[in-house]
């Protein structure tokens, strides 16, 4: 009789746990649905995950090897992947380059063919990375050597033909890129 009593309470406990788990799942679903409805479009993923998603999207679109895209993001703003919760790529360099891929406004305007504001370049992650990948694609079509392309990336596209071959920081950037 004792065994049957223990078995009964054991089965009862399992049933209660299952019902509680189902209730928690339902509450979680309702909460997510409520938040999505209430905050329509204002819920965002962590900044580092947004950068990751944009790099994945545009490196595929423009056929940029992922290791190139991620190395440049690391060299420009120390981006270390989608789980780098401390990452904050909304940076402006001393030269005026903006965002996670450090794009100069003049370069952005040249690559996209329309005026991009500094604010857009800094805060619109997707646009910043799209311009970056488009620039890398254009440079690779022109030079066909990723080490050279990555060095030229650092100077900005309009300046490539004028002084990139002689730029000391360009040589330093190329050597840092190759080491990563």
Residue ranges and their predicted role:
Residues 1-17, 24, 28:
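N-terminal Sec-pathway targeting helices
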Residues 27-180:
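Catalytic glycan-binding domains that act on GlcNAc-containing polysaccharides
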